[in-house]
A protein has these predicted regions:
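Short, surface-exposed glycine/acidic/tryptophan-bearing loops
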Residues: 106, 163-184
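Extracytoplasmic and endomembrane cell-envelope/extracellular-matrix remodeling and assembly machinery
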Residues: 74-124, 131, 142-143, 187-190, ...
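Bacterial N-terminal signal peptides
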Residues: 8-18
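Alpha-helical scaffolds flanking conserved acidic
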Residues: 146-154, 170, 218-223
Length: 442
């Protein structure tokens, strides 16, 4: 969800009019567009990561290879027609949306990007939308949100379920780990539900609903989806309480300023593609699938090899299992397959569970400790010897020579002991001692 880079702010006056005719595009290249106003202020905006996605990587996805094809009856020409500003304004105004879709030069730049350089990507996304848009609409409807939000994943991920951004956001809706967990998605070393289209869509709808309760403005909601509500509140504060996206624009993070224009352009391109000679890829919807619950760990390769199912298809149907391991031991976990394959799985599940299990699911629960007995004896002997030596030194006897004129009391005092102890150590019953003799003091 990281998207734009800004060098110099456009003036607030320009923003108040939504860039309508005062901004001018100076240049546009593969990664950024430079905009200048009539005061000479310049602004560089990076395109979202998804707008730089290589179309070949999109076409290499399993569902693209299996179910999408070029429409031979539609001639997609490379010529992108040029229309007047009035045409774009009217088309955006005519969109059946709750959210406002204003026109300005920034929006125009993103429209040109989608309908120009990204024509093949739009063709792919129009075909792939047959898989995902019904899921998005179902989740958005459940939270009573505007259905035009279904195009948010266009700018987030280019409808690539396994997309991962440079910042670590993942899935169609590009959740960061913390936000994903906050909205109930399981994320660990084996499972990443950010990649599950259904679960991630409901989590995204929930998050968008919460953001609208905070801001009550859909443009601010979209911006907050990109940079977080706290950052939007800071921008509002710096803009003296203004709650219009285009008025707080100068105070937004660099990566957020192209976000709303990109969203507007995505709605335009996914609606008016015909007017720009873009042909959607034909989509042959796959047969319906179902899930089977497993309560033991299982690897997708075990299923693939025993049931002769394309492993790539299993991965496509179960994108949340990031290492192909379904952790059924932790809790009952679903595996999505064709209904006929589920029947075969149930019939052969014992064989499937046992197939290459020691190779694919090696995870020891107990381990034996290997002991070298010869080393152990030597080590133990050394420890005992060291202990004995320490004890011997601490308990070693000590004797001193009795001086002329010495008494037991004087000897005891010099050596930190008592007369009674001297008598006990030396077997003395009285005080009779002789100078020059040895007496034990310890």
């Amino acid at each position: 969800m990281k998207h734009s880079y800004i060098k110099v702010f456009l003036t607030l006056c320009l923003l108040l009019f939504g860039f309508t005719t005062q901004a001018q595009i100076v240049s546009s290249d593969e990664d950024e567009v430079i905009i200048t106003d009539n005061q000479g202020n310049e602004e560089d905006i990076d395109f979202p990561e998804a707008m730089n996605e290589d179309v070949d990587s999109l076409l290499s996805l399993y569902h693209a290879k299996a179910y999408l094809s070029i429409d031979e009856n539609c001639q997609m020409r490379d010529i992108n027609p040029v229309f007047s500003q009035e045409v774009y304004i009217e088309r955006l105004r005519s969109l059946p949306t709750v959210m406002e879709m204003p026109y300005n030069e920034v929006v125009q730049t993103f429209i040109d990007r989608y309908t120009g350089r990204l024509r093949r990507s739009v063709s792919f996304m129009l075909g792939a939308s047959n898989f995902f848009i019904p899921i998005f609409e179902e989740a958005l409807e459940a939270y009573q949100l505007p259905l035009e939000l279904k195009y948010l994943p266009i700018i987030e991920s280019a409808l690539k379920p396994n997309a991962v951004s440079r910042a670590g956001a993942a899935g169609l809706w590009q959740f960061m780990i913390t936000t994903g967990k906050d909205y109930g998605l399981e994320i660990n070393s084996l499972v990443d539900e950010r990649r599950d289209p259904l679960k991630a869509s409901y989590a995204a709808a929930h998050y968008l609903s919460d953001l609208y309760k905070i801001f009550n403005d859909w443009n601010l909601v979209i911006a907050a989806y990109n940079c977080g509500p706290a950052t939007i509140n800071k921008a509002i504060h710096r803009a003296n309480g203004e709650k219009d996206y285009w008025k707080i624009y100068p105070y937004l993070p660099r990566e957020t300023r192209g976000y709303v224009p990109a969203f507007i352009a995505a709605n335009y391109a996914m609606t008016y593609y015909c007017e720009h000679n873009i042909c959607p890829m034909q989509c042959e919807l796959p047969v319906k699938t179902d899930t089977v619950m497993v309560n033991r760990d299982i690897h997708l390769s075990q299923i693939s090899e025993i049931l002769d199912i394309d492993l790539e298809m299993l991965r496509s149907l179960n994108p949340s299992y990031r290492r192909d391991v379904v952790p059924g031991n932790t809790k009952p976990s679903p595996i999505r397959m064709l209904p006929t394959d589920i029947t075969r799985f149930i019939d052969q599940q014992n064989t499937i569970y046992e197939h290459r299990a020691s190779e694919l699911l090696t995870k020891r629960s107990t381990v034996a400790v290997t002991i070298d007995n010869s080393y152990s004896r030597k080590s133990s002997k050394g420890r005992r010897s060291r202990t004995y030596n320490r004890k011997s030194k601490s308990l070693a006897s000590k004797s001193v020579t009795i001086r002329k004129g010495d008494t037991l009391g004087a000897i005891a005092k010099r050596n930190g002991t008592t007369v009674a102890n001297l008598r006990r150590l030396n077997g003395i019953s009285g005080n009779d001692i002789r100078a020059g003799k040895r007496i034990r003091v310890k």
